[in-house]
Amino acid sequence: MSYLFTSESVSEGHPDKVADQISDALLDEFLAYDKNSKVACETLVTTGQVVLAGEVKSSAYVDVQEVARGVIEKIGYTKSEYQFEAKSCGVFSSIHEQSGDINRGVERADPYEQGAGDQGMMFGYATNETENYMPLALDLSHSLLWELAKIRKEEPDLMPYLRPDAKSQVTIEYDDNGKPLRIDTIVVSTQHDEFIGPKGISQKEADEAMQKRIALDVKKILIPRVKAQYPAHVQALFNDNIIYHVNPTGKFVIGGPHGDTGLTGRKIIVDTYGGKGAHGGGAFSGKDPSKVDRSAAYAARHIAKNMVAAGVADEMLVQVSYAIGVAKPMNIFVNTFGRAKVNMTDGEIAAKIWDIFDMRPKAIEERLKLRNPIYFETASYGHMGRKPQTVTKTFSSRYLQKPVTCDVELFTWEKLDYADKIKDVFGL
């Protein structure tokens, strides 16, 4: 019997994502000037106010106000009527030094014996239902909001009323074998300007006219653009019977941090697999790679994606766990959901992963090049399923004479650089 599965995403202007992006921008700034920085930075955003808190060990000085305001401006909160605006909002910082008790458990004379920054379990997941080995419902949800933001920033005349805050949700019907059959429902809620109608009509009538315009634009402008980004077999899932809910409350003028308080780390399912697979509970943003909540989750995704791409299974979940101060993981667990393509148990597959991948924190950092300022880009539209690329970044501050320019690789955990080795090990 078929079933329905739903995933959601939120835009870069969603308050929780504003917080995530500020935290990761601060992390990047510290790493740009000191690659050995230890950072755990949390952000709260609300009406007209940003609050920064956390622990840092670094030789770098970062102008946290400058960084936070730059992120807010980049997202698009640049008008006073938003009641959260880059130049005028308050920025309060309570960032202090990292605990010595934690640091003694992490740093070692032999870097490869560097202990995990905390205990916990982390998961990586991959499925071959999309070209980027991500669950389709989540991938579509991200694409809807990525394209909406692109229209807002690059083609404002198309949908001139758009504001930064938005959410999406996609429901897909699957068959018993986990194959997508059709898109059932699409939900898009986007913040918009107040609509002032011509004289002689009420505000209610003006709101209804605005709602009608937004719904039409989503169906006629946004959906076709997103559909065109996918291969033919995914395009075929779009159909005339899709249920659309566009701004279902009828109005979405008050939004962003003025509408809801935002906090770092509250969109961990959006950040990962949209409810597919599993999650260990640890958030990513604002954490340097000594925190295995982040680095080991990326490494587990790297394993799962390369294993599925190599043909070991059509779907795979990988769990890894750590004790604080201990380098070697407690375990590696694999679940192929009965979709393995090799004549092995999941336990036997996990045993081979131990032989292929060094999962000590320092080895992960080096393999995935995680000591670079690569994190701001991860903080919106998902940490997984993104395209690996090399970019040039420049960091500058009014307090430092020379800017820092560096070439960095983004989303290294999405590279299929171990697929051939896996094929050799598994005889594929």
Curated annotation (Swiss-Prot):
Its main location: cytoplasm. One of its GO terms (biological process) is S-adenosylmethionine biosynthetic process. ATP binds at H14, D165, A166, K167, K251, F252, D260, R266, K267, A283, K287. The keyword Endoplasmic reticulum does not apply. Mg(2+) binds at D16. It is found in: Cytoplasm. Residues 98-108 are annotated as: Flexible loop. Its EC number is 2.5.1.6. Its cofactor is Mg(2+); K(+). Pathway: Amino-acid biosynthesis; S-adenosyl-L-methionine biosynthesis; S-adenosyl-L-methionine from L-methionine: step 1/1. NCBIfam families: metK. This is S-adenosylmethionine synthase. It comes from Parabacteroides distasonis (strain ATCC 8503 / DSM 20701 / CIP 104284 / JCM 5825 / NCTC 11152). The lineage of its organism: Bacteria, Pseudomonadati, Bacteroidota, Bacteroidia, Bacteroidales. The gene is metK.
